[in-house]
Amino acid sequence: MYRIAMKKLLKWKESKRRKPLIIEGARQVGKTWLMKEFGRLYYTDTVYINFDSNSRMAELFASDLDTERLIMGLELYSGRKIDPDHTLLIFDEVQEVPRALSSLKYFYENAPEYHIVCAGSLLGIALHEGTSFPVGKVDFLKLFPLSFKEFLMAAGKERYSELLSKQDYPMITSFKQTYIDALKQYYFVGGMPEAVQSFAENKDFNEVREIQKRILAAYEQDFSKHAPNEIVPKIRMLWNSIPSQLARENKKFVYGLVREGARAKDYETAILWLSDCGLVHKISRVNAAGIPLKAYEDLKAFKLFLVDVGLLGCMAGLRQRTLLDGNDLFIEFKGALTEQYVCQQLKTIEDLGIYYYTNDRGSCEIDFIVDTGEQVIPVEVKAETNLRAKSLKTYQEKFAPEIAVRTSMADFKKEDRLVNLPLYAVEQIAEL
């Protein structure tokens, strides 16, 4: 299975300013596999340490963090010589031993020749809770579920993925039915590596759904195991409300859908916990279109999306036939899946600020508005081929953006400053 993040890891390996690397991401998005595969492909040897299942390693880091001493201990544990130039050190579930995190500072300052990559499913929570952290002494890489282009590659359609990257839209249009069929499959399967691998090998949607159910069950177990007891019920209620939140025409998060009479102060910690885990994406509202968009962020108004479109369908009980064959009763939730899909693809684009826009009266709403650092692009999302976009026109008249995007199942088309970008090509938005 190919992950685009592998290119970023290789760039990190070759950098003269390399620091210990921390890979962030939700549970089961493929962090462990990526680190091990990176070691297998680009290093002579790999020493893998899982701090969740190895108490001896906790003892090693408990006292002195002298790097020579630590390397000796790792060599004794692994039974292998650690060559700074040819050995990859992998620290997995590193949040379980906070002093292992702290040691990264000393590796950077005193032994930068060693190649160290770290990951942890709940690392975001550990950092937020005040674990001593080597600020400025580490590099970061965020890993998400497989994007649609990665899904195409995993499904044996590498050339189709390459064609999207080349943005040859006349040729892309010639093969649009292949892309549309694959996109419908992606809506069901999503991008969680185990689900994608199963689908690529067996094409069994029932098996995919069982895998997704197991992943969701593991997340629920994490709530009980790792979250503070007093907020576990709130996390569960909030988590389970997300499909119904997104099924509404106005997808702004409403606390009253979690529990009648609920208020923001009751659930802010639960949202933060899920966000720190990487299980939800919080997309805030802006009411203006200046650069940087973050300066116009309204922290009180936001949408909550799940980490993966396949998991959203699983939580909602969406059947394969309904999605692939179509059903008139499915129209409303199709909008939820489509917006979830677009959010998920946008999140994979590096250094892209993602928000949504409404004016103060609420009469104009743009599904997403993204900040590339050089320009602000409004993005209107359509689940089918309907190209009517009244809000987008209103936005254009007010802010006159250099480019506006309407993404739908319709073919690529550019008229003046308006681009219709096919949903299956939305990853290319920053390249327009």
Question: Where do the protein language model's features map onto the residues?
Answer:
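Structural recognition of the conserved hydrophobic beta-strand(s) that form the central parallel beta-sheet
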Residues: 90, 115-121, 142
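Pre-Walker A adenine-sensing motif
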Residues: 2-16
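Short glycine-rich substrate-engagement loop in P-loop NTPases that contacts/grips substrate
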Residues: 53-85
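Accessory nucleic acid-recognition modules appended to NTPase machines
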Residues: 200-365, 369-370
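Hydrophobic positions on the alpha1 helix immediately C-terminal to the Walker A/P-loop
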Residues: 34, 38
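Conserved catalytic cores of phosphodiester-cleaving nucleases, focusing on short active-site segments
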Residues: 346, 366-385, 404
